[in-house]
């Protein structure tokens, strides 16, 4: 006997939850902000390319036009931007920036129109290249550009 009938059944919500974790939707985003800065440069680039962007693709294929994604996308965009402004560590700042940018993509998926879905896809494609470039900056060079990022008693 199924738990529920129709498009809003248990399987729908479990699949949505799994993809939302992968997309780092705001209540489920903590793994991204902790994992990206701590990984190696190569690891961060691969994480940036193959986690959130694949999740956005899955959202496009499965959940296009789902209204609640609009609100989660707007929340992600605002949350990521606000926390990026307050962050002192450059790689964590870039991680919050990724949360913010994925929020724009999720909001586009929630709209569900052809133009919004094309925009979300193009945004995911272009942000993956921008993330590659920005996450490839070694930590040693970040201290030259962002001097208040230096730990006390240590010079970069």
Segment roles from a protein language model:
Residues 1-156:
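Hydrophobic transmembrane alpha-helices and their helix-loop junctions in integral membrane proteins
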